[in-house]
Each structure stands twice: as C-alpha cells, then as structure tokens.
A protein has these predicted regions:
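Extracellular glycan-modifying ectodomains
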Residues: 1-300
Length: 300
C-alpha cells in the first residue's frame, strides 16, 4: 500500500477491535466533506474516523473496515448496492457488521445539474470507472456532436429554469426510491450559485445543511458550521451567462473551468473529449440514451 494513503487514513488502517466508540461516514467523495463538518462540531458526541471513499475500498481494506464498524455507534451512509465492486460493501451488508445499538442515518448521493445544464456523468458496462479527459464530466453538446446529431441548444430563461427544476425533481425522486433518512433536494434552490461546484460536488451551503440534518437525526445539536474553506474544491464547472441570467443569480458568469485552482478553457476540454469519443463510441450511445430527457428540455 502507498505510504501516503496509509498516513492519510491512519486512524482507519490502525483500527482495532475493542477501542473507543466512533462515528463513521461511508460513501463517495461527499462523505469526507460531511465527516469534516460533523468533526468540526464542538457538540458532536463521538470522534469521527476518516474512511476511504467506498469506490476506493479493496478486499485488503475489509479487515480494517470491519474492526472499525465493530466500534461504530453513529453510522451515516449513502445508499450502496449489495456486492458493490464485488465486495460486501452494500448498505444492507455493512449494517449487519455494526453493533446492535448503533444509530444509522442514510443520506443521498447528491447530484445537481441545474447550474451546469450540459454536464453529465455517463457509465458503460465495459468500464464503469472510465471517465473522459481533462475533467471527469461529459458535455451534452460534445456528445451530440460525436453522435452526428445536429443541435442548437435552447438556453432561454424558461429552458434553463426547466432544467434546474428537473434536477431538483430528479434528486427528490432518487431520495424517495433510496428511502433515505435525511434529504437535501429542498436545499438546492435557496443555495443559488453555491448549490454545486460540479454536478456531483455540492457547495458548502448544501453540505452544511446536510450535516445539520444528520446531526439532528443522531439527536445531536444541529450546529455544523462553515469550515472556512471550500470543501469540494478540486473542480469547478463553468457558470455561464445563460444560467446566471435564467436563474437570476447574483454572481458574475464564468465561461471556463477551474481544475486544481487553475483556469482551463472550455474549448480545451471539449476538443480533448471529441478525440476521446472517437476511441470510445459506446459512451456516446450510452450518454445520448441516458440523458435523452434533459436533451429534450434543452431543445433536442
């Protein structure tokens, strides 16, 4: 194992059975942000332990995970399907390894494309982890171009608002289907331009609202506070003039990406991804099918 990874997750890899009670947050990259907010609360009842994102866990990590779960009294988890990545990491499977008195709060996988109407995630069974170059997000304009489909997107205020409303409704429906204990879909509109940095990187106001609801669900004071930094800060998608105008946002538009703090021209992203689609045509077909409803809202 990489020494940097072991050091970063020292409490996880050093977990032993019979230690003090802890809180664990399990899920994707959003889970660590939630954990940071819970850990920053002076009233949160037990220490939190940083755990690798569920998609990074391997069979070699299971002994450390099980030792930690045996000490977990507060467990906050996103929905994870059974046998995820051929490992016993599904929510139902993990819950069986918790102490009988552990409190469990289920929270949603947060996706919001309302600020970034062309941004999309596309998976294909050939390799569900494969993402396009430069940024790990697809662009519906580049997808349709690669598919050979003529399209002049409708970015009228009405269309932009319809896409934003559809995004909120989509998340609310996923929350309902997953049977989560706390929701966040109702927080998106009021968060405005800070609702999301990318479609799966919610902004601080949404994460703080989520953390307070998780605290409340655990019976703790809902006092999560801004940590003084942007939590999911690695990538920021463009916030275009059409979106700023259509949603009435009180911010300046930005047509470029920000990746690792560095501006990246959107044209550079789209050019690299056009080349990528030439070598990965199955992702084009999958993306067009998966996002047909949103394409229709945008005039396709």
């Amino acid at each position: 194992m990489d020494n940097g990874r072991r050091a970063h997750y020292a409490d996880f890899y050093g977990a032993t059975t019979g230690g003090d009670p802890v809180a664990v947050v399990l899920g994707n990259c959003q889970a660590e942000s939630l954990r940071v907010l819970l850990a920053g609360s002076p009233t949160f009842p037990v220490p939190t332990v940083r755990v690798p994102p569920v998609h990074e866990l391997t069979a070699d990590d299971l002994p450390a995970l099980d030792a930690l779960l045996g000490r977990t009294v507060l467990f906050a988890t996103q929905p994870v399907r059974d046998d995820y990545r051929d490992l016993p990491l599904g929510t139902r499977q993990v819950l069986t390894r918790l102490p009988p008195n552990a409190a469990v709060v289920r929270w949603p996988v947060i996706r919001h494309y309302g600020l970034h109407p062309f941004a999309a995630i596309v998976r294909h069974p050939d390799d569900r982890s494969l993402v396009p170059p430069v940024v790990p997000y697809h662009d519906l304009r580049t997808l349709t171009e690669a598919a050979g489909v003529p399209w002049e997107p409708d970015l009228s205020p009405a269309s932009v608002r319809a896409v934003a409303a559809a995004s909120v409704a989509d998340l609310a429906e996923r929350e309902r289907r997953a049977g989560v204990d706390v929701t966040v879909s109702d927080l998106l509109r009021d968060a405005g331009a800070s609702a999301a940095n990318t479609l799966n990187h919610p902004g601080n106001p949404v994460l703080i609202g989520l953390a307070r609801r998780v605290q409340r669900a655990f019976g703790a004071p809902a006092d999560a506070a801004d940590p003084g930094r942007v939590l999911l800060d690695s990538v920021h998608a463009p916030l275009t003039e059409a979106v700023v105008t259509g949603l009435g946002l009180d911010v300046e538009p930005r047509e470029h990406w920000i990746v690792g703090g560095t501006p990246v021209d959107d044209a550079e992203v789209r050019t690299a991804q056009r080349r990528w689609y030439a070598d990965h045509p199955r992702w084009v077909d999958s993306g067009m099918a998966r996002h047909a409803a949103r394409l229709a809202l945008l005039g396709r």
